[in-house]
Regions:
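Catalytic core of pol beta-like nucleotidyltransferases
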Residues: 1-26, 36-41, 52-108
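Basic/aromatic recognition patch in beta-strand/loop cores that engages polyanionic ligands
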Residues: 33
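Short beta-strand->loop micro-motif that forms the acidic, two-metal-ion catalytic signature
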Residues: 46-50
């Protein structure tokens, strides 16, 4: 995929997520190899979707999965989307979240 192609896919994903969540969406953070600038041609797009009131992980995951799948298919790239409550994002000691806070790039 061309370098700019994954960015268009990410923009489309963020746009659809905004449409679903509205004011509950507090941000989208790109993390992993794309955020570090180390991505290869086949690298996926790793995102944390930061929400107000993300009290039921699987409910939000099930809302995000079809969006990520649809955009992934449209752009021939893999998007992973993990929902997380804003307070968990700010305070978690989970290594994935700590790493996303350290090297992540806010895209929304």
């Amino acid at each position: 995929m061309p370098v700019s192609g994954w960015r268009v896919a990410l923009e489309d994903f963020v746009s659809e997520v905004r449409g679903v969540y509205g004011p509950r969406l507090r941000g989208v953070v790109l993390y992993g190899s794309r955020a570090r600038g180390e991505a290869g041609e086949a690298s996926d797009i790793d995102t944390l979707v930061i929400l107000d009131r993300c009290s039921h992980f699987w409910d939000d995951f099930n809302l995000l999965s079809p969006i990520a799948s649809r955009v992934s298919l449209e752009h021939d790239v893999v998007i992973s989307a993990i929902p997380i409550d804003i307070s968990d994002y700010e305070e978690s000691r989970n290594p994935l979240v700590v790493n996303a806070r350290r090297e992540g790039v806010a895209v929304a």
